[in-house]
């Protein structure tokens, strides 16, 4: 496998897994309260990574504060927001807002570095988010609450901070040791409310399997792959895995839930994939003179390229 192919796999596979996560969360909510879903997926994720010997590789003592931050900002806090949010907003809007994840990651990276991303990357982010919006339009309704939207936005801001923290930690220690410890921190933080909810849940086979898949896949494997991608190619490029989430959710909605898909949704899915390709390879747009655009932004905002 070439380096470029491996990098694409690091982006596509988490998107495929997370695209199915909303189905697993919805199934889990049939058996347990939202805080129980959060604790269950995090605890299963921690146990999954415990099976890997590399998880126990020592990490620098100075990095423990950052790892704890990842446990809070990447895991405990945002994963607590989504189950509550899904009770107040439509799946279409949830998918659209998740498509904005790379924008939040890029914004946080720009604030930390005092530097805007390259023009081609900015264009790709805009295209990808535009695709997510187009996909969601047919499913938007007036039933979405401001409270649910705020929960999702807070989760995305948290992701934006966490991915930028995780990159240097992964480069120094490796993704599995960092995420295993971060999941341990998140398990401890979510246990006081989550464990009683799990113990008092009305479990049947379907939600139990859903939580196992959500924890092992979406909370362990996908997070490790994304942390690896952040270390290899930067937080902003790693975050474009989010552009695949609404595409996968659309496909699963048709196959599993037999939902009707509009032409507009299919167009949006194609736009999402184009945006991901542009961010991964900004040279696709070299003929559009993004450097000149960057110079204008530099003069007007005080950032540098």
Model-derived segments and their meaning:
Residues 3-8, 30-39, 59-65, 137-158, ...:
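Juxtamembrane helix-entry segments on the extracytoplasmic side of multipass membrane proteins
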Residues 39-40, 75, 94-100, 163-187, ...:
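Helix-helix packing/entry segments at the starts of transmembrane helices
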Residues 28, 37, 41, 85, ...:
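Hydrophobic/aromatic residues within transmembrane alpha-helices
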Residues 43, 49, 68, 108, ...:
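Hydrophobic transmembrane alpha-helices of multi-pass small-molecule transport proteins
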Residues 46-49, 105-107, 111, 125, ...:
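Transmembrane alpha-helical segments that form core, pore/gating elements
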Residues 17-25, 50-98, 134, 215-233:
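Specific transmembrane alpha-helical segments of multi-pass solute transporters/efflux pumps
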Residues 1, 41-42, 137-138, 207, ...:
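C-terminal-most transmembrane helix of multi-pass membrane proteins
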Residues 30-77, 102-109, 157-165, 179-198, ...:
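Transmembrane alpha-helices of multi-pass small-molecule transport proteins
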């Amino acid at each position: 496998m070439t380096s470029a192919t491996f990098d694409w796999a690091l982006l596509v596979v988490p998107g495929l897994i997370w695209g199915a996560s909303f189905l697993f969360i919805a199934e889990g909510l049939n058996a347990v309260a939202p805080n129980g879903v959060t604790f269950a997926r995090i605890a299963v994720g921690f146990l999954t990574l415990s099976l890997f010997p590399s998880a126990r590789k020592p990490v620098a003592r100075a990095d423990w504060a950052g790892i704890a931050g990842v446990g809070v900002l990447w895991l405990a806090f945002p994963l607590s927001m989504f189950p509550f949010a899904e009770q107040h907003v439509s799946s279409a809007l949830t998918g659209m807002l998740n498509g904005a994840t790379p924008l939040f990651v890029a914004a946080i990276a720009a604030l930390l570095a005092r530097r805007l991303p390259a023009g081609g990357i900015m264009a790709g982010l805009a295209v990808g988010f535009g695709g997510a919006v187009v996909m969601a339009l047919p499913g938007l309704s007036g039933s979405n609450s401001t409270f649910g939207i705020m929960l999702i936005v807070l989760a995305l801001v948290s992701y934006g901070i966490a991915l930028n923290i995780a990159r240097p930690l992964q480069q120094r220690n490796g993704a599995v040791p960092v995420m295993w410890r971060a999941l341990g921190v998140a398990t401890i933080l979510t246990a006081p409310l989550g464990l009683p909810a799990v113990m008092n849940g009305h479990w049947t086979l379907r939600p139990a399997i859903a939580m196992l898949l959500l924890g092992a896949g979406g909370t362990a494997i996908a997070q490790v792959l994304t942390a690896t991608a952040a270390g290899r190619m930067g937080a902003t490029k790693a975050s474009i895995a989010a552009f695949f989430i609404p595409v996968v959710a659309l496909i699963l909605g048709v196959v599993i839930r037999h939902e009707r898909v509009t032409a507009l949704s299919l167009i949006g899915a194609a736009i999402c994939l184009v945006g991901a390709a542009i961010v991964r390879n900004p040279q696709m747009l070299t003929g559009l003179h993004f450097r000149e655009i960057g110079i204008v932004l530099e003069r007007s905002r005080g950032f540098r390229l």
